[in-house]
């Protein structure tokens, strides 16, 4: 039986829950709702997300949603309505072409089934959907809504790029927003980055209106969507041809939880490999990562499948049920779980940089992410676009160290917020181009750099150039390490007076033929600079150290960065974890309890995750706390041995959750 208590709460979604989505096809109109409700209950979920099916002739009642609500509520389940306003029939599109997406070539965007894409700027989204929502909220006491595919439709289901919408509504809105700039046609146009912010604002404003509309009519119903909804949404999925970033789910959940820990985040995890292959089951080991990474950051797990359960053999449903039931069993641990890491790594925002800059910033970010994750240094992901908002809601004050990964020019509000944060005791580490404006001036008073003198991105000019500790015998061709090669980009700065630093450049020298490979002379160019600002510290690493680690994989990049982080940032964490680097560790708290998630990622492959290797010998050292430390392994459901403040971990299979008390 489901959880009857969940049906009694006004804002029921404030407490952890699990969800299962049945994305219905036309052939599913005769679905047995009682059987599906039983399946969802046994899966461990508390909520059912369902789409209305237009083909109701197969049902005696003629009303699938009414039947589903009755079945769900009888089992103690919540029922949420999935709605999609992104497309209309060809007949409606012909009557209202002004509602439709219009490509730069003047074409409409058409789909299978005679459907045509509409634009969120137009009257269908801005006006007509509220008539539809009014009808639904009057007819059905649903417990929530999810609005699917609320985008500007640059790309379709076939992954074909159609460009920026040029409809009359977009033209008028853009004219007012931009002050007369030309509406871009695609990513290569000059105003495209600004258009991304424009389109984000349209979606956020519309989401806020939908949320307000629903809450006035069904006060206990939630909206799952974006920034201005009740529940933040992330779809965890795979894609043909997309490079695997193994940490995508934990990254996205963390970026929302670090911003507003009290606002729920739901991760809808896709059972199939990709939209063009909806009957191809996702690899179970890969699907497990979606749900484990979700709950490790305090998110709500959801399983997304096609059709009626049992009709398509999704191989990942077994592991999905195991993790969903685990989350439900230990709901008292997840209810109130909050981030407590002292370090924040900023996730680059595409709307604040060009496509090329974004690609370089993401490489830098991911290299730094991997460096900290492999050494189990606790950190959260902070979204660049929400930095100033986090300063306003005091979210930045939770952090002792913030890291800016090659972000380039900052918005003025972000720059002011970061300077204030450093002056009040924060420690800021900026790499490469971070906080350098279009004219080379450094935007942050808290950094040791004054202005950028030059930037070198030419690969051949960086060859055979290094940073290393000060050398005493370099002229004799004898070097002391570690020696860190330059890769990606190097920014030469003018440093402020009375600032310090470390490491020195070993200037470029011949590297071929081998008999000529010598002559790297030490120069007075800093490998990093340091300055005090108020009661905090600013650090600049003038080259792409994270990109070097991501693209070359040399441990000297990782060690160089993490040493600076530990010595200059000095985050005062409560624990130290010693375990294989293939384990992802996250740290949260629930009241006085410290909650440590350990996820075995040894099965990572090119496109997905496969079988993992059990990992032994792990330890957690409690750095701050009393003499009565206790540790409970939730998956094994047993108390762990603690010796002189060191917790001896059991063999790590796929995952474990350690609850530490007695601080």
Predicted regions, residues:
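N-terminal carbohydrate-binding accessory modules
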Residues: 1-39, 87, 333
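Carbohydrate-binding surfaces of carbohydrate-active enzymes
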Residues: 2-9, 14-17, 79, 185-663
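Conserved, mostly hydrophobic/aromatic
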Residues: 19, 40, 72, 129, ...
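Short, acidic/polar
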Residues: 25-42, 125-136, 250-253, 283-291, ...
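Catalytic domains of carbohydrate-active enzymes, especially glycoside hydrolases
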Residues: 32-55, 291, 371, 375
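Short, solvent-exposed turn/loop segments enriched in Gly/Ser/Thr/Pro and often Arg
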Residues: 49-54, 83-90, 146-157, 226-229, ...
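Aromatic-lined substrate-binding rim segments of carbohydrate-active enzymes
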Residues: 52-88
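Active-site-adjacent "subsite" loops/lids of carbohydrate-active enzymes
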Residues: 65, 81, 85-140, 149, ...
